[in-house]
């Protein structure tokens, strides 16, 4: 049956003949594998053998090998229903092929085309047991029950005689008995003649059966091939003969055991050694039984395999060794066996170990790293151990050659990394190993800066105890106290101040720690600094005090604390803005109220003559504007800046309709003129704010908007609107014309 020139091919033979087309044509191997498992052809654990491969064609090739080893029935189910569902076009191509090479169908139970036609007609798959193949008959016998019973009885006696011939090693008798018999006949328990010959270790009979076309991949009821039987019994010569003839060393039974598994667990080391030797000859970059042992954490099997010549660093299709699989699955026992046997430890394996973050597994590598890894790889492992705060691993790596002061591509040393992450246990080990504590990052961050930033008081205390200056300067001249203030760490600040940190150091931008705590809204840090008598009047490069920053951020509690500590509520910065200007501009109503309660001047002017009300009006901050107006009892409602603009000009120009209404209700002059003799109505028309224009021209509670007022270029509000080019300007023009009775 091994010939490729026949007219009635079996499913196995179709796979063999069309192997290359199937390997390249199966596009969804994972889907097909799911179907094969669902239909009982393959066991779920077979998925590991296929899924470990990354190349689709390699997956397909291995899947076909496994199918062939499962026998004819498995190959039939592969075609129908599995291939038909997963790859319908490829199935149709195969069906057309087997139909074309068959001119006549004589036995639909055995020929693939008959099987496919039958199943296509039925539309479903029926589970069937492997059929018993009877001795060939030369005469046409009538199909009647009594005669069938006679045949079965005769057949039973015949089979008993065959088994006796095999068990006794009587080759001559076997030749006589099998003249009219298919050598692949299924006997009891799905056993073939080859199964029995292999189990009894009859080498000569095995060779005879192989010459007669005995199939190597047929399985018994336990899913075992003839090679399984030979290996289980320790028949080394027979096992080697079968392996050399092409038997799959990696075929698995129903318990996922290969022949090597069975030989090893039964103590047949000679057989193990021979099969390992055959495996090494036939495999290149494929999964070995040692890989399987690593995945299963079968340390005993791994020991036997290695003792009998298995290559400890053999790579599979993904270029992974058995050690890599053992580590990836967290299988410490097998990993220990592999390491003891000299398995190479590379960076990928160390990465896999760190992914599990299991200290006991990582410790297995430590005595091997110096021999197996480069200095760069050992140093990289040290950084990983520091990152995970594995103190014992850090110590062991340093003892085995890792450079405690190594620097990675980002400029970190292990000390700097531990400080930044706040990993105190790893840091203590590094200090005990005499690591340098005064190294800096490229941006000038010191280990103390990083410890403060991470909030690790433990690390900060160690550094200060070791003599690191608490006033050490970092990026932009920031001290550790600046960072602790920025990150709201009052306990850290207390530690730094206790050991002599300066209370009011300034950065390149002129910021003190109090500035940074105030602008970040850190109430606790501000309280800590004020308790230490920090300078509330200190100004940064913009001339701002801490109160300016608290006001701009709307931090009411900090504003109140600063005022209580003596901060000047009317302090002016470089542009003459007071904290009240900044709070009003941002619309922080409660902050405005707090500052006013602290005697802030509502009419204070900046360098452009703008009051806090100007800022509120420009930015549309209605509530803040209302608070300011109420505080001054509207006395400052018409204050003008250097361009003689009132708050109403700014509110109108920016289209803040509601605020325009508030200002008008507080007696703002509706026709006030700026330096260009523009009224608020001119400003609203120029910027195209229709709602604001409506609010102004419809105001009737007091002085009304002068529609005829002209500015210094002799244009009234209508003419200003007509100069605009937007739809809003057109609508304003129409509105004004109607208001002026120029149109109906």
From Swiss-Prot:
ANK repeats: 157-185, 189-218, 222-251, 255-285, 287-314, 318-347, 377-406, 410-439, 443-472, 476-505, 509-538, 542-571, 575-604, 608-637, 643-672, 676-705
PROSITE patterns, per database record: ANK_REP_REGION, ANK_REPEAT, CARD
CARD domain: residues covered: 7-79
Superkingdom per UniProt: Eukaryota
Any single Pfam family the record assigns to this protein: CARD
Gene Ontology biological-process entries: inflammatory response; innate immune response; regulation of apoptotic process
Induction section of the entry: Up-regulated in response to bacterial infection with S.typhimurium. Highly expressed in macrophages when infected with S.typhimurium.
Observed effect of gene inactivation: Morpholino knockdown results in reduced caspa activity and impairs caspa activity in response to bacterial infection with S.typhimurium. In addition, larvae have increased susceptibility to the bacterium S.typhimurium.
Tissue: Expressed in kidney, heart and skin. Not expressed in muscle, ovary, gills, eyes or brain.
Region Disordered, residue ranges: 127-146
Keywords: ANK repeat, Cytoplasm, Immunity, Inflammatory response, Innate immunity, Repeat
GO cellular component: cytoplasm
SUPFAM superfamilies listed in its UniProt record: Ankyrin repeat (SSF48403), DEATH domain (SSF47986)
Subcellular location: Cytoplasm
Bias kind Polar residues: ranges: 137-146
Subunit structure: Self-associates. Interacts with caspa.
Physiological role: Probable inflammasome component which mediates inflammasome-dependent resistance to bacterial infection by S.typhimurium through association with activated caspa.
Name assigned to this protein: CARD- and ANK-domain containing inflammasome adapter protein
Species of provenance: Danio rerio
């Amino acid at each position: 049956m091994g010939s490729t020139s026949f007219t009635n091919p079996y499913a196995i033979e179709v796979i063999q003949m069309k192997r290359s087309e199937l390997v390249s044509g199966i596009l969804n191997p994972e889907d097909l594998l799911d179907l094969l498992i669902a239909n009982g052809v393959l066991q779920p654990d077979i998925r590991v053998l296929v899924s470990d491969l990354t190349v689709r064609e390699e997956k397909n090739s291995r899947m076909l090998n496994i199918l062939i080893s499962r026998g004819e029935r498995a190959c039939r189910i592969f075609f129908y229903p599995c291939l038909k569902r997963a790859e319908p076009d490829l199935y149709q191509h195969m069906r057309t092929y087997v139909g074309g090479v068959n001119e006549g169908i004589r036995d639909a139970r055995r020929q693939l085309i008959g099987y496919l036609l039958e199943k296509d007609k039925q539309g479903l798959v029926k589970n069937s047991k492997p059929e018993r193949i009877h001795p060939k008959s030369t005469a046409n016998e009538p199909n009647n029950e009594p005669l069938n019973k006679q045949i079965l009885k005769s057949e039973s006696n015949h089979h008993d005689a065959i088994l006796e011939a095999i068990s006794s090693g009587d080759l001559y008798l076997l030749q006589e008995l099998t003249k009219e018999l298919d050598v692949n006949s299924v006997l009891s328990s799905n056993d073939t003649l080859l199964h029995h010959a292999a189990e009894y270790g009859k080498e000569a009979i095995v060779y005879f059966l192989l010459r007669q076309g005995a199939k190597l991949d047929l399985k018994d009821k336990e899913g075992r091939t003839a090679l399984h039987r030979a290996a289980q019994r320790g028949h080394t010569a027979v096992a080697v003969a079968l392996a050399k003839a092409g038997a799959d060393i990696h075929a698995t039974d129903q318990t996922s055991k290969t022949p090597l598994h069975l030989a090893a667990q039964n103590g047949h080391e000679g057989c193990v050694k021979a099969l390992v030797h055959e495996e090494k000859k036939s495999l290149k970059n494929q999964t070995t039984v040692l890989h399987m042992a690593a995945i299963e954490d079968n340390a005993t099997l791994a020991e036997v395999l290695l003792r009998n010549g298995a290559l400890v660093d053999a790579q599979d299709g993904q270029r992974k060794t058995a050690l890599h699989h053992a580590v990836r699955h967290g299988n410490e026992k097998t990993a220990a066996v592999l390491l003891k046997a000299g398995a190479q430890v590379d960076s990928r394996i160390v990465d896999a170990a760190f992914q599990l973050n299991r200290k006991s597994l990582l410790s297995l590598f430590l005595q091997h790293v110096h021999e197996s890894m480069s200095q760069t790889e050992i140093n990289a492992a040290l950084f990983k151990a520091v990152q995970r705060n594995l103190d014992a691993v850090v110590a062991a790596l340093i003892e085995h050659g890792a450079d405690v002061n190594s620097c990675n591509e980002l400029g970190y040393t292990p000390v700097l990394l531990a400080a930044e992450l706040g990993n105190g246990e790893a840091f203590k080990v590094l200090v005990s190993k005499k690591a340098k504590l005064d190294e800096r990052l490229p941006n000038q961050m010191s280990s103390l800066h990083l410890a403060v930033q991470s909030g690790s008081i433990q690390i900060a205390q160690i550094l200060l105890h070791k003599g690191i200056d608490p006033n050490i300067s970092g990026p932009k001249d920031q001290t550790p106290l600046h960072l602790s203030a920025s990150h709201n760490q009052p306990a850290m600040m207390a530690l730094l101040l206790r050991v002599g940190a300066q209370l009011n150091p300034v950065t390149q931008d002129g910021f003190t720690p109090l500035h940074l705590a105030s602008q970040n809204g850190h109430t606790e840090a501000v309280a800590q600094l004020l308790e230490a008598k920090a300078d509330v009047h200190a100004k940064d490069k913009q001339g701002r005090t801490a109160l300016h920053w608290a006001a701009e951020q709307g931090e009411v509690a900090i504003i109140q604390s600063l005022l209580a500590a003596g901060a000047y509520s009317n302090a002016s910065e470089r542009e003459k803005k007071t904290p009240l200007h900044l709070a009003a501009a941002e619309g922080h109503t409660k902050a405005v109220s707090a500052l006013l309660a602290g005697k802030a001047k509502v009419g204070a002017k900046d360098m452009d003559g703008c009051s806090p009300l100007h800022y509120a009006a420009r930015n549309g901050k209605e509530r803040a504007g209302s608070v300011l107006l109420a505080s001054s009892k509207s006395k400052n409602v018409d204050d003008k800046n250097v361009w003689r603009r009132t708050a109403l000009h700014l509110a109108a120009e920016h289209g803040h309709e509601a605020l325009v209404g508030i200002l008008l209700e507080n007696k703002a002059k509706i026709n006030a003129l700026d330096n260009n003799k523009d009224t608020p109505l001119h400003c609203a028309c120029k910027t195209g704010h229709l709602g604001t224009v409506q609010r102004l021209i419809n105001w009737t509670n007091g002085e009304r908007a002068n529609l005829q007022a002209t500015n210094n270029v002799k244009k009234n509000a209508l003419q200003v609107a007509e100069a605009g080019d937007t739809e809003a300007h057109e609508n304003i023009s129409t509105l004004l014309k109607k208001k002026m009775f120029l149109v109906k």
